[in-house]
């Protein structure tokens, strides 16, 4: 799949916006958001001639994105035959280990990864494949948890 980390972050933001639009029963905004998500997930050969997105494709694109995200949040994902449990990224830390939350969410994470230089600057992080950045975040959290455990 060709999902970039930047498009992943955009899709998550759009999904949140769609929940708000659904609460307001704003069908035209929901349709527009679903179209935007679809265009972030699918690549057209000629970006100058992007066709109107069929509603059925938009619904399936959102369902697929949501299902993959749910898979990441709910259990191990097999990558290269290895079970990677991304849930460690979302576990709450004990209160003594918890840093103040700056409330920047995924945007803040992009800047943190860019600051590390592993994938380059923010634009380059945004253009990096989603799974590469997620694996890097997993590696960082895994190492942090094991360092913490070894200090005790």
Regions found by a protein language model. Name each.
Residues 1-152:
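An amphipathic, hydrophobic-aromatic interaction surface with interspersed Lys/Arg
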């Amino acid at each position: 799949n060709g999902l970039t980390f930047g498009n992943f972050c955009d899709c998550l933001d759009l999904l949140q916006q769609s929940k708000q639009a659904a609460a307001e029963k704003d069908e035209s905004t929901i349709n527009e958001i679903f179209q935007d998500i679809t265009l972030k997930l699918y690549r057209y050969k000629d970006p100058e001639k992007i066709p109107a997105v069929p509603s059925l494709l938009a619904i399936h694109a959102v369902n697929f994105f949501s299902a993959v995200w749910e898979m990441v949040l709910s259990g191990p994902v097999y990558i290269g035959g290895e079970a990677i449990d991304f849930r460690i990224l979302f576990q709450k830390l004990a209160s003594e280990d918890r840093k103040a939350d700056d409330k920047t969410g995924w945007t803040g994470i992009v800047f943190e990864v860019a600051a590390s230089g592993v994938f380059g600057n923010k634009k380059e992080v945004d253009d990096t494949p989603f799974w590469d950045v997620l694996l890097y975040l997993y590696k960082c959290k895994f190492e942090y948890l094991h360092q913490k455990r070894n200090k005790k």
